[in-house]
């Protein structure tokens, strides 16, 4: 089998996805990298090719901010799948290209409005569209689905008390007063701290303010704090309404961080400028750090068919990875691996239309080459 994938966006996640696909795919796979910046493209191509023994091609295409160039049209006509690593606001545009040119499509964005547009656009598509398939949303949701299916099989009850999904992109060390270091997009962090979170309470979907339900949790004998943030639940609230008394997505941090954030937010205007103002303030106080780690924890808690309380939980701790002498940060691999896994499943299968995170097969996804290698799943 020989296939070709177009990767839109050549930043940290795009170049990581390209490297993983080229080095780990077990069939012949050519790549085209697309970006609005030729400089980004040159850097990403050098990153993917450097030190590699693979001989498959890696082409580049500059993508105009508006419209469709002849070079892009030719590239799309030659590709089987489009992986969308562009900014979330571009997702409907990229999905439209995928549908128009008969490509499969997978993306990362948690943006609700953009996701709804793609669901409408792709409902009658002749190819598959896997949405929100990064780390969170993405891997964490499939992990939760896997644990829920295991709970039902083991304990004979399909109604549960709580489903918890938690992810932390952290640093190995953290210093007072903020106990944090940026390992990914600062504006992404600021936004998830102020946008509301979609949850289930008393079996019904509702919204809660970000950072309004803090808890302390011990994972692997270390203490963390977790609180509600936006975006990570994907479509699981819709799937579990009526099945779970409580469901939420929370971001993991070192103890003390959220108290510091609350102090900063309290001194800022509570209007549409809040994400940008919080980002600016945090950038002045918090360093950006290359040495990162990603912590993932999911749990399903409920009663078995004899009325005894049970819990199934799973945690993964992911550190940076080196391939061909190139260091990939944990946030890169944990985000890119699910995207790559989705691409391979689309290319090998016959799925059509929209595939949401609750509809991904946990068994094949979790034990696929990309996800299992990055997350060390046996």
Language-model features and meaning:
Residues 36-40, 112:
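Helix N-cap at the beta1-alpha1 junction of Rossmann-like dinucleotide-binding domains, i.e.
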Residues 71, 82-98, 112-113:
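Beta-loop-alpha module in the N-terminal Rossmann-like domain of NAD(P)-dependent dehydrogenases
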Residues 76, 80-84, 105-107:
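N-terminal Rossmann-like NAD(P) cofactor-binding module of classical short-chain dehydrogenase/reductase
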Residues 5-11:
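Conserved N-terminal Rossmann-fold NAD(P)-binding element of oxidoreductases
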Residues 150-378:
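C-terminal catalytic/substrate-binding lobe primarily of soluble NAD(P)-dependent oxidoreductases
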């Amino acid at each position: 089998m020989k296939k070709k994938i177009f990767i839109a966006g050549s930043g940290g996640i795009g170049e990581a996805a390209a490297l993983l696909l080229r080095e780990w795919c077990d069939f012949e796979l050519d790549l085209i990298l697309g970006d609005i910046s030729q400089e980004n493209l040159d850097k990403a191509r050098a990153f993917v090719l450097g030190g590699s023994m693979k001989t498959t091609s890696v082409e580049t295409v500059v993508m105009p901010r508006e419209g469709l160039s002849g070079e892009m049209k030719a590239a799309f006509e030659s590709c089987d799948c489009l992986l969308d690593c562009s900014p979330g606001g571009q997702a409907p545009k990229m999905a439209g290209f995928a549908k128009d040119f008969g490509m499969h499509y997978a993306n990362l964005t948690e943006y609700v409005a953009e996701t709804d547009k793609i669901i409408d656009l792709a409902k009658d598509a002749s190819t598959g569209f896997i949405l929100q398939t990064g780390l969170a949303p993405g891997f964490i949701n499939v992990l939760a689905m896997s644990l829920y299916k295991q709970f039902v099989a083991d304990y004979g009850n399909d109604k549960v008390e709580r489903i918890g999904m938690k992810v932390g992109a952290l640093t190995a060390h953290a210093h007072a007063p903020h106990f944090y270091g940026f390992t990914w997009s600062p504006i992404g962090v600021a936004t998830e701290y102020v946008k509301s979170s979609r949850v289930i309470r008393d079996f019904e979907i509702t919204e809660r303010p970000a950072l309004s339900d803090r808890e302390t949790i011990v994972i692997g004998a270390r203490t963390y704090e977790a609180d509600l943030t936006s975006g990570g639940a994907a479509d699981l609230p819709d799937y579990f309404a009526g099945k779970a008394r409580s469901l939420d997505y929370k971001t993991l941090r070192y103890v003390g961080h959220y108290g510091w954030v609350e102090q900063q937010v309290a001194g800022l205007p509570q209007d549409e400028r809040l994400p940008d103002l919080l980002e600016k303030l945090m950038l002045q106080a918090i360093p950006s750090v290359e040495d990162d780690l990603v912590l993932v924890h999911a749990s399903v808690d409920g009663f078995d068919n004899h009325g005894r309380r049970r819990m199934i939980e799973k945690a993964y701790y992911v550190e940076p990875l080196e391939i061909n002498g190139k260091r990939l940060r944990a946030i890169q691999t944990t985000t890119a691996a699910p995207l790559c896994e989705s691409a391979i499943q689309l290319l090998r299968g016959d799925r059509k239309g929209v595939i949401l995170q609750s509809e991904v097969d946990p068994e094949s996804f979790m034990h696929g080459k990309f996800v299992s290698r990055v997350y060390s799943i046996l």
